[in-house]
């Protein structure tokens, strides 16, 4: 018996450019049919609002999530989803595998890899910060709209092993896991950056645009649960 169905809304299916005032009606009808069928079968809905579907226009025109403007574009999309289907959803994920912004920036945050090198930490973590703020503001919006359901954070988990039993190898493993896996949920659940990220930012010359309003919204609108995907044991 299927009790819960998790599925994702494609931002670009509803708003192909990402900044339209009105949604694509064919996309709306498509999702209406899914919600209707699940409710008819008595199946609870676990909805992911953004699953690697940053509209290409926003990637190419403003640089994806490294631009603060993305927060407002995302919230316009989120407001439509909440108003259209909010009363039918039991569990919410504003962002799928949010730590993908670190290990796969193009998929996670719509960052295009520079042609002359690799991604730079300044852009990667700035983009993640703006997603954290958008996540918190989505929860704030849902509370103002009296939307039922609970909101969670989600990361992609990997299984790492130290090279040897030596303390230095185990410590290196812990530090890598902190950045790769845990810090995103730490921010979304606790409402602030953990101590180890401050050290990491200083060491890597990362200076984020974080406003007082950002800090307040992160602290006030944290997630209700932690979730993760886990595809393999090694």
Q: Where does each model-flagged region fall?
A:
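Charged helix-capping and loop-helix junction motifs
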Residues: 24-30
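Catalytic domains of carbohydrate-active enzymes, especially glycoside hydrolases
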Residues: 1-10, 220-226
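Glycine-rich, proline-tolerant flexible connector loops at the mouths of alpha/beta enzymes
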Residues: 9-23
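Active-site region of glycoside hydrolase catalytic domains
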Residues: 17-19, 32-234
